[in-house]
């Protein structure tokens, strides 16, 4: 392979990689309206979309760069948060947070359900964990040195 081909391949790979900007967890929920209300009213998210118009069963809620997708399936398909499968799998989503302190205070005032209040955890992360209306646990943390 020539140097030109290698450089072109690397450039193509870098261009492709730079297209990845975010990931959104997709949570199965029991009651879509109740789940949307929890994220909007308690956690300050905005409803980005829902559909389809004739039979709404999915939605996306967003706050800044964090987006969570919600979907109701059928009455017999219930939410299955990670912690229900094993105690070590306690997070369903991790949101990098530049400054968790004011967010923690806001959530506390809004009546959000906390799994773990603002603190350092053993791997040096500073932040907190919340539980949504369907039992999913979302972690809001930053590294000890202040970086996300």
Give the predicted meaning of each segment.
Residues 2-26, 46-96, 104-131, 142-148:
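Vicinal oxygen chelate
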